[in-house]
């Protein structure tokens, strides 16, 4: 499911995504009759960082603090926690990526790397009744992973500083697990965790919502 201009949806529509993103199902009650429907999907949402769209460009944004706060308040903590990855991309970064073409992988090379990773993933999860790492429960994740002391310290520091929540911690571990599989490693290393954390960039949102409290 691809939702463009995510912030243009009504708050109640955004919040209604919480159950299907968490459980892979949706419950509907009509005329006293209860129905549960499957709703296991991958959600990709895009949005501008502020109403004018230039919130990540230094000196260009025309929005006031209150306009930004009102705009971003639709993104509740529980909704953010249900995204595995939150990426910010400024125009400067996008232009740089367009230029950096030399030495990049071809589509066929990327496809082969992904297929190899999927095979490793299936082998790893064969005893967990999961199709992929994203479907691992908190209990299954803890049983599967044996984190080093250094990895645990990295997560603890991030949690204590308020950078991540408990649910967000599971998301980071799942992304780190995928990175581990892509690099054909047998355990999650600190560098895998640090990379996974860079793919969970909610700083610009928290900065606006928490400023001036």
Name each model-derived stretch.
Residues 8:
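Catalytic or ion-coupling anion/metal-binding cores of large enzyme and transporter domains
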